[in-house]
Every structure is written in structure tokens, then in C-alpha cells.
């Protein structure tokens, strides 16, 4: 096939700036081949190179006594004791999910699961954090239905429980939805597999499904803004097969028991190109590939297509040659391809051959560790104007408005489409707070949560970044878990705009401060930039996924609200309504500053909850919607009415941080308040759980009526 001439239009179509193309010419001293141009495009885009964010990502805390492996590998690895580790990561599949919702979301799940089992861990839990445009937007229903079906279709067939997540709606996502997928797995802490190649002349082996033309250019597409040519990008979306992925996982984990694996990497963004380059670069080696040996499911595939295909369910491995026969037998047993497609070489070289013809011959390190890196100009986000007066409202009317919104109504419509109990180790399913999964064969359990409040981040990126981590800390604490570590999924607009880069920098500063103060290092993550359509950016959305440990399932704080239980707020309430849910849903306002996050108070109050778990029957953190919404959710979940003391609107619906709502019997309440007095923690009685109505001061409604609104609002908006 005649390869196209390299023209300015072709260079631009590959997402390369003119100055970046000049760098390529300087590096290789000649015009690149078409395949080489594609390789540079894939490796130098934002999705693979982090060229706009690397400088700031380096400032995050990534180490701690519990951290076995931090950022840089397929997933983070954290010690949980007894020779075991939890392996986890969160990653975006935003652009593909907007173009083709079902396959975009499904392959997002598949990709994050591969990141986990590539490290030698069997997946035990998944979550997803989803952001969509306003429900009335003509594309929103299609996106919600397609994304949720895609996540369920892939995860359910693969057989991993979905234990939590988030769903939000906002006009800022009308042109770009966000699909952030999280997965966690268990491994022996001394049997973690890494991606750095070692040894010269070692076989490079292709594993899994065959290569097709799906996903060619996907990583480059995921590093660009959308415009009115979006439909043309549909072929760049990958197609997933969860049954093949299941077989690939079983074969990979079985292969790892043979001792044949030197290094292993899944094929995700930029496919064969990125996996081969990363393995070689991390090991200080070069790689030669012979593409005629690549298993192909389509005829007449070019070198360019094979190198950039993002066909799913594929891995690349460097193998001990003496164990080739044993390794091949494992993959043949699982009816998967096993093909030697190249070898490691001593030179810093990426050599691509196809039927004896050189298709690419590049300096390998220039594609990865020494790729371009930018210090983008940025401007701080201006301080928010003071909050204008917020009128007092009838509290039941305010609560009903929140419950009627798909943002704050029940999410059963979503998680009932997911298998939450497969593997039979889920101790708490989605609905309220963190999900919990038992560590099979032990008394331990792991808790998982995903959190961010984008309105806060837009108003005050640094406080919003802190708040995302602090809320994750509280959600883990509220179920009794000790927070261990975090993964971040940083979703922002165009980093070439100084105001967007300022949001990113501010959020990173806040996340870093909170992770350091709360001993929750970042061990993995993902950056998704250029989430803009026709120049309109999403809300800055730095999603935080976090994992906590319970030494025993006896430590789980339940949701056992009973008739007569006292409702107590742990933490200081001042009545912060800026950027609150009430302000948005009742008054159609998004003004004021984000709530301040006092990290010392977060730690002190979290320690207090865990130390006094024996006195607490139910616990939830106070976030969106404040006391009124949190108290209703506890009451609704238990089927018990709620009487809250009369208080001003800002006290009932304010979103002050570092707070929890707990339920306990009268004697326990007295003991808890006594303990608080000795530790400097504020605990306030705010009402009790009783009857079959929700009464707030002098305003009252039937619990059943409010519950019906709560349970129907999401489906009414999107079904």
C-alpha cells in the first residue's frame, strides 16, 4: 500500500503541533514514515505522555510505609498485612463514551480491569464515577442509558462486583460526559508483576485476542477537543468482549504461576506501540517487532494500523525463553492467541519490521521518558464573590426539592443494572457511603469510595481539591475503615487556556495537601484533558478513588437505625451555603465560595469516629445537602421516621466539612458526648429517628411520600 505523503494537514490530523513536528525532525534527522508519524502522535499525546501535567503530578505525595508500588505502573499496590496487597487504579474513558456510549464505557471497564490483573491481582471490586449534561439535553438520555448498559454489560459478564460510584448532571457536561472507571484486586505482596523489560534477546510475546482496526487513533482522539466532526471519530472507539477478557485474566494469572513472566503490560491506549515502548523504556532496553507475526482478525492490515490499533483484551509480555512451551500451553488451553512478535535488544531503538521492510526505526527513549514536557502558563482562579443573601425556606420543601433532583435522588436505577454481589464477598452494596468487600479467607475487609464536588473545584480549585480527598476520607471512616491510599482521575478542559491550567494547578495543590495531612498517598491515576466542545469546558472534576482497610468485619459501622435512636452531628456546623446543593436546586444559583476544609479537624473527627465505633449504630458523612439530606437518607434506608430540631436553613442544609451524622441509643449518645468532651471534638444532638414522618421543626411530611420521590426522581429523568 502506498503510504500518504507527510503534509501539514496530516501532521495536524495526528494532533501534533508544528513545533512538535520540528522536534521529531531534529530527533530523527529526516522526514518520518507514516508509521513513525503515527507512533510519535500516539506516544506524545496527552493521554500517553502527560506532557501538560507531569510537572504538577510530581508534587503529589506518593509514598508511605503502606505503599509497595506508587504511580508509574499499571496500577498502585498497597500493603494490607498478612502478605497481601490491594492493587487499584481509576482511569477515564470520557471521549470514547461520548462518541459511542455503550462500547466506550464497556471498554473503559475492561481496560481498568486489565490494569489490575496485569499486576498479578485478581479483581474483587469496581466502581464508576459518571458525569452527564442536564437531563433535558437531547443527548443525555442516550448517553446515560448507553454508558450504564455498557458498564453493566461488561462488568457483569466478567464477574466483578460494582460496589459504589457517583452520578451527576450539570449543563457543563452537555458536550462531554465523563466516565471514570475504578477497579481493585487482591494479590500476594511478594508476587507483584511489573512492566519493565529485562534481558537482551528475550522474546516479546503477544497474548489474548486478535488485532483489528477498531480503536486506531483512539489515544490521539482522547487528547483533543470535540467539534462538529465528532461523528467521524466513531471508528476510533474500541469494541469489547468481556468473555474474552475473563479468559485472558484466568490465563494470565495461571501463566504467572509458571515463573515464565519477566515483565508484562496490557495493551491499552496506543495499543502495541505504547505497551512495547513502556516495557523497553522502563527496562533501559530497545524493542524489535516483526508485525507479520501479530495475530490479525482483518485482512491486509498495515503496519500503521497494527501499531495503533486499540483492539481490546490484549497483553504484551517479555518471556523466559526456556518456558515458552509451558506458557504457550496455558494460552492455548484458554483458546487465546500466543505469538512471539519480537525481542528485546540492547540498543535504545524501536525497530518495526513488516515482511522484511523497515516501517519504523526510532530512538525508543525519545518516545517515552524524554518526550516533550510543558510548563503551561496558568493564572490563579479569582476568589469567589461573597455569597449573596439566601432566604429562609420551609425545610421540607427544601428537602423535597433535593430528593426530586436526579443529582440527589436514589441511584437504584443505575446500580440495580450492575451485579453487586458476584464473588459473594460484598459486605455492603451501593446506596449510602462506601462499598465494602470481604478479603476472602480472612477476617479483613476493604472499603471503597469515589468522591468529588465539581462546583467546589470551579469556585475554589484548591479547597475543592482538598474537599474531594477529605470526603473520601470521611466516607471510608463512616463505615469504620482506616483510609489507606488514593487514586486520582483528573478531568479538566483545555490546558492551553491559562484559566483551565490554573484550575488544574489549584486542584493538585489541594489534593496534595489533603493526601499528605490524612496519610492517603496517591498511588495511581489518570489525567484527562481537553474535555471541551466548541470551546466550552466541563466543570473541573478531579475524581478521587480511595481504599480503606478494616482489620475485621466486626469493625464495620452499620446502618442499623432503629426507632428511638438519637441523631448526633460530629463536627462544627457554621452553616456554609456557598456552592451548596440547596442553592443550586432550590434557587438555581451557583455562587459563593467552596466550604473551607480544615484538615486537622478532618483527621481529629475521623479518628474520633473510628475510636468510638462501638457506640455508633449508623454513620454517614455530611456532604451535599447537609444535615437534612443525610438524615433523610439514613431514615429512608432503615424505614424509620425522622424528627430534626428546628434550625435555620443554613444549619439544616449547609455543607460545612469534617462532619458526620451518627445514630445511637440514648446511653450511647451520652457516652459519645462524654468522649467528645475529653478529645476536643464537637458533638451536637440534632433530633431522633422515630415514627413514620419526617419532621423538621414545625414542618412535616410522610416518610413514605418523600421516599417515593427519592426513589423515582433518577429514573424519571433518564429512563
From Swiss-Prot:
- Extract the coiled-coil ranges from the record: none
Reported EC number(s) for this entry are: 6.3.5.3
Q: Active site annotated at which positions?
A: 47, 93
- The residues that hold Mg(2+) 1 are 91, 526
BP-aspect Gene Ontology terms: 'de novo' IMP biosynthetic process
Q: Which Gene3D superfamilies match?
A: PurM-like C-terminal domain, PurM-like, N-terminal domain
User: InterPro entries annotated for this entry?
Assistant: PRibForGlyAmidine_synth_PurL (IPR010074), PurL_linker (IPR041609), PurM-like_C_dom (IPR010918), PurM-like_C_sf (IPR036676), PurM-like_N (IPR016188), PurM-like_N_sf (IPR036921)
Where, by residue number, does ATP bind? 50, 89, 488, 525
Compartments annotated for it: namely:
Cytoplasm
The family database entries (CDD domains) matched by this protein are listed as: PurL_repeat1 (cd02203), PurL_repeat2 (cd02204)
Q: Where does substrate bind?
A: 92-95, 114, 238, 310-312, 528
Against Pfam families, the record matches this protein to: AIRS, AIRS_C, FGAR-AT_linker
UniProt binding sites for Mg(2+) 2: 115, 266
Please give an example of a GO cellular component term from this record. cytoplasm
Q: What class of enzyme is it?
A: ligase
**Assembly and binders:** Monomer. Part of the FGAM synthase complex composed of 1 PurL, 1 PurQ and 2 PurS subunits.
NCBIfam families in UniProt: FGAM_synth_II (TIGR01736), PRK01213.1 (NF002290)
Q: What does this protein do?
A: Part of the phosphoribosylformylglycinamidine synthase complex involved in the purines biosynthetic pathway. Catalyzes the ATP-dependent conversion of formylglycinamide ribonucleotide (FGAR) and glutamine to yield formylglycinamidine ribonucleotide (FGAM) and glutamate. The FGAM synthase complex is composed of three subunits. PurQ produces an ammonia molecule by converting glutamine to glutamate. PurL transfers the ammonia molecule to FGAR to form FGAM in an ATP-dependent manner.
Would you tell me the protein name for this molecule?
A: Phosphoribosylformylglycinamidine synthase subunit PurL
Organism per entry: Ruegeria pomeroyi (strain ATCC 700808 / DSM 15171 / DSS-3)
Amino acid at each position: 500500500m502506498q503510504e500518504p505523503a507527510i503534509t501539514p494537514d496530516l501532521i495536524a490530523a495526528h494532533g501534533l503541533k508544528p513545533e512538535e513536528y520540528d522536534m521529531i525532525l531534529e530527533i530523527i534527522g529526516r522526514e518520518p514514515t507514516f508509521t513513525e508519524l503515527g507512533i510519535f502522535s500516539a506516544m506524545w499525546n496527552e493521554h500517553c505522555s502527560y506532557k501538560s501535567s507531569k510537572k504538577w503530578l510530581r508534587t503529589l505525595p506518593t509514598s508511605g510505609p503502606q505503599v509497595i508500588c506508587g504511580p508509574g505502573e499499571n496500577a498502585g499496590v498497597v500493603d494490607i498485612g498478612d502478605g497481601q496487597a490491594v492493587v487499584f487504579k481509576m482511569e477515564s474513558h470520557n471521549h470514547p463514551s461520548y462518541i459511542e456510549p455503550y462500547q466506550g464505557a464497556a471498554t473503559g471497564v475492561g481496560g481498568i480491569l486489565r490494569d489490575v490483573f496485569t499486576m498479578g491481582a485478581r479483581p474483587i471490586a469496581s466502581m464508576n464515577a459518571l458525569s452527564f449534561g442536564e437531563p433535558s439535553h437531547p443527548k443525555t438520555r442516550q448517553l446515560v442509558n448507553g454508558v450504564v448498559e455498557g458498564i453493566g454489560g461488561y462488568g457483569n459478564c466478567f464477574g466483578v462486583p460494582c460496589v459504589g460510584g457517583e452520578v451527576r448532571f450539570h449543563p457543563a457536561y452537555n458536550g462531554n460526559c465523563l466516565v471514570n472507571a475504578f477497579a481493585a484486586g487482591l494479590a500476594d505482596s511478594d508476587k507483584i508483576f511489573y512492566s519493565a523489560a529485562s534481558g537482551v534477546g528475550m522474546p516479546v510475546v503477544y497474548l489474548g485476542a486478535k488485532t483489528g482496526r477498531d480503536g486506531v487513533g483512539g489515544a490521539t482522539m482522547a487528547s483533543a477537543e470535540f467539534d462538529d466532526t465528532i461523528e467521524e471519530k466513531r471508528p476510533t472507539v474500541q469494541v469489547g468482549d468481556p468473555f474474552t477478557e475473563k479468559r485472558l485474566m484466568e490465563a494470565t494469572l495461571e501463566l504467572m504461576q509458571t515463573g515464565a513472566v519477566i515483565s508484562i503490560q496490557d495493551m491499552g491506549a496506543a495499543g502495541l506501540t505504547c505497551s512495547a515502548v513502556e516495557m523497553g523504556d522502563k527496562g533501559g532496553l530497545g524493542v524489535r517487532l516483526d508485525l507479520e507475526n501479530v495475530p490479525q482478525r482483518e485482512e491486509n492490515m498495515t503496519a500503521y494500523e497494527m501499531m495503533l490499533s486499540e483492539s481490546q483484551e490484549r497483553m504484551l509480555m517479555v518471556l523466559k525463553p526456556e518456558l515458552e512451551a509451558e506458557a504457550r500451553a496455558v494460552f492455548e488451553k484458554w483458546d487465546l492467541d500466543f505469538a512471539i512478535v519480537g525481542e528485546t535488544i540492547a540498543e535504545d531503538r524501536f525497530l518495526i519490521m513488516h515482511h522484511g521492510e523497515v516501517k519504523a526505526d526510532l530512538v525508543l527513549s525519545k518516545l517515552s521518558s524524554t518526550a516533550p514536557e510543558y510548563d503551561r502558563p496558568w493564572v490563579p482562579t479569582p476568589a469567589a464573590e461573597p455569597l449573596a443573601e439566601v432566604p429562609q425556606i420551609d425545610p421540607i420543601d427544601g428537602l423535597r426539592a433535593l430528593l426530586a433532583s436526579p443529582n440527589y435522588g436514589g441511584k437504584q436505577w443505575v446500580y440495580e443494572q450492575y451485579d453487586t454481589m458476584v464473588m459473594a464477598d460484598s459486605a455492603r452494596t451501593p446506596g449510602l457511603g462506601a462499598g465494602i468487600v470481604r478479603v476472602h479467607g480472612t477476617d479483613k475487609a476493604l472499603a471503597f469510595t469515589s468522591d468529588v464536588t465539581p462546583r467546589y473545584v470551579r469556585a475554589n480549585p484548591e479547597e475543592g481539591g482538598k474537599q474531594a480527598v477529605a470526603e473520601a476520607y470521611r466516607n471510608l471512616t463512616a463505615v469504620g475503615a482506616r483510609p489507606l491510599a488514593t487514586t486520582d482521575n483528573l478531568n479538566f478542559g483545555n490546558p492551553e487556556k491559562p484559566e483551565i491550567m490554573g484550575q488544574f494547578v489549584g486542584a493538585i495543590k489541594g489534593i496534595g495537601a489533603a493526601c499528605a495531612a490524612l496519610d492517603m498517598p496517591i498511588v495511581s491515576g489518570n489525567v484527562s484533558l481537553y474535555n471541551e466542545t466548541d470551546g466550552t469546558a466541563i466543570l473541573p472534576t478531579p475524581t478521587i478513588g480511595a481504599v480503606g482497610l478494616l482489620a475485621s468485619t466486626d469493625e464495620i459501622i452499620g446502618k442499623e437505625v432503629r426507632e428511638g435512636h438519637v441523631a448526633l452531628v460530629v463536627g462544627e456546623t457554621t452553616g456554609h451555603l456557598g456552592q451548596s446543593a440547596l442553592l443550586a436546586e432550590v434557587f438555581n444559583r451557583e455562587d459563593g465560595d467552596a466550604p473551607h476544609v480544615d484538615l486537622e479537624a478532618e483527621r481529629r473527627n475521623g479518628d474520633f469516629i473510628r475510636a468510638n465505633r462501638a457506640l455508633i449504630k449508623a454513620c454517614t458523612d455530611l456532604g451535599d445537602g447537609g444535615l437534612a439530606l443525610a438524615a433523610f437518607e439514613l431514615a429512608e434506608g432503615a424505614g424509620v421516621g425522622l424528627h430534626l430540631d428546628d434550625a435555620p436553613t443554613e444549619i439544616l442544609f449547609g455543607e460545612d466539612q469534617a462532619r458526620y451524622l451518627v445514630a445511637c441509643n440514648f446511653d450511647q449518645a451520652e457516652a459519645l458526648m462524654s468522649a467528645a468532651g475529653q478529645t476536643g471534638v464537637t458533638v451536637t444532638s440534632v433530633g431522633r429517628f422515630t415514627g413514620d414522618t419526617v419532621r423538621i421543626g414545625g414542618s412535616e411530611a410522610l416518610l413514605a411520600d418523600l421516599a417515593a420521590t427519592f426513589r423515582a426522581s433518577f429514573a424519571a429523568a433518564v429512563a
